[in-house]
Amino acid sequence: MSLLVVGSLAVDTIETPFDKRERALGGSATYISLAASYFAHGSDIGLVGVVGEDFPEHAWKLFQGKGFDTSGVEVIKGGKTFFWAGKYHYDMNTRDTLTTDLNVFADFKPKVPAKHTSPDYLVLGNIAPSLQLDVINQMKKKPKLIICDTMNFWITGAKDDLMKTLAKVNALVINDGEARLLVDHPSLVVCGHKLQEMLAPDNHRIVIIKKGEHGALLFYDQFIFSAPAYPLEEIFDPTGAGDSFMGGLIGYLTRWETIQYATVKRAVVYGTVLASYCCSKFSTEAIENLSMDQIYRRFRELQSISSFEDEPFRTQKHDSAAGTM
Amino acid sequence: MSLLVVGSLAVDTIETPFDKRERALGGSATYISLAASYFAHGSDIGLVGVVGEDFPEHAWKLFQGKGFDTSGVEVIKGGKTFFWAGKYHYDMNTRDTLTTDLNVFADFKPKVPAKHTSPDYLVLGNIAPSLQLDVINQMKKKPKLIICDTMNFWITGAKDDLMKTLAKVNALVINDGEARLLVDHPSLVVCGHKLQEMLAPDNHRIVIIKKGEHGALLFYDQFIFSAPAYPLEEIFDPTGAGDSFMGGLIGYLTRWETIQYATVKRAVVYGTVLASYCCSKFSTEAIENLSMDQIYRRFRELQSISSFEDEPFRTQKHDSAAGTM
């Protein structure tokens, strides 16, 4: 199954309470494609984005090693790659942005190469909703699933565009604060259902609300699935965790001909696994060379920490008197 | 199995964005015992607390109807019952305390009646840690399990007392903010393990961190269990939800001769069920007359929303090459 990933390719300078890394590899498309590569064949993954001539050599080598098709990545002569610098606070849940230099990303107009205009799965990383819509309009064939991300900046600044994009999308991945901002309701359950109503009506409507250390909620048609977080003792660098989640999720889905609830639930759990690994080293370091053993081990751990047995005293018949359970 | 509940018995005036209730029944011991009564026989539940002559007649009738032994509830002649008034904000997660009149609770010295000094299970609701310790010292026989609650007020104002109490306790129920305050670490996983170290060393060490809408984390010896929250669309009145959780949890445990991990996991889920019902009406109204059917239905729903199937392509042997999962 082919997978097209559209998003940012960036250079990040990251400071945490423990360490600092200058000009590391970053960007939503980077994390998404790397995380997806554990499930999809590298050669089935196409990237669309823009970089400057300073995009790190090791990143090109990494993409090449994975077999990604980077023909959709525009390299701007004399241009500089999108640069972000941020500093995480002690609790790792909040961060200050120190620098955002859009550089070549400021004029990004995604051009999907002809050979990528009919992917099975389309992932729209967090870019302007109008650009996400533009990419959808470049599709020659309707993908099995279009999944997108967004952020506060677009919810408050480009809501009309965002609503138009969501109406063409089958799955939305969003964090809890963004969900509440977009729906304007305190209950995440209500938010999830209202967000589903914003999506394309001609397919399953899938909403995934990421809650960081509290796991994720999946809304799939009328079903709700509550996924646990992987119980990490320490977070080294949370940059890209949300994108790794999305990549693990969509990567896993590309293994399947059809979208089914049981499969999407597992995909959310694999997304959780990739996000957990992402946090354990700087930048993309932890998700560059995982083994499937490492991934499956955490999948099983998540199953173990969230499962409980049914009531042994119960039979099919429900007793209604207290004391007879 | 006998259960002794020590805590506050109160009268609450509660205002939410939707409605208001004057002088409703409240108090930690009230919610705990009512929630526990669905699993334990009423006559096995003893209450220790203090009230004034104004304690509502319908509360006495309710306790009597459940069969609770209230011989440990002191009625102070001419005294007034602990009174709390609060107002919830729009998001229902935050509230302002408008009035706290300790009244007879100010001089509360728990006196455990002789017949209750060897309960199988002892629950210490949120009162001063020195009083919790005093109750433990009144025990003639070591209970199978001593479980306690606490709050910010004691963590900051009576930490030494609290640590002495915890060292005699087998299980602690605490919310996420309190856990971080007591341990001073941002990771709840680290907090859970550090809190376990504070508990009595001669038994299972059980810590339950309540995360409200995000569910709960159970730390049981070296195991972690992540329990989902019940997906409520609307919260009517969250007062007493934490105590109802504790009551459902301990009530369920009294059905068992021994403390086992699988049982404690289910107990956490039943606690979640009782807390979810508690939020659906004012005060104790929703947990006064539940059927076991209603309780078990939500237990099964929680099992359904949190379960996912193992990877169908996997066998016992872990493949380590990507693409062969």
Regions found by a protein language model. Give the residues of each.
Chain A
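Conserved phosphate-binding/catalytic region of the ribokinase-like
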Residues: V189-M325
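Conserved N-terminal subdomain of the carbohydrate kinase-like
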Residues: V11-R23, A40-V123, N137-K142, I295-M325
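Short catalytic helix/loop segments, enriched in acidic residues and glycine
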Residues: D19-A35
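Short, conserved phosphate/pyrophosphate- and ester-handling motifs at nucleotide-, phospho-/glycolipid
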Residues: A36, N175, G242
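Conserved phosphate/ATP/ADP-binding segment of small-molecule kinases
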Residues: N137-L145, N152-S226
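Short beta-strand scaffold segments in enzyme catalytic cores
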Residues: L34, F83-K87, G215-F219
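Alpha-helix C-terminal capping segments
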Residues: L34-D44, Y252-T254
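Extreme N-terminal starter segment of soluble prokaryotic enzymes
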Residues: M1-L4
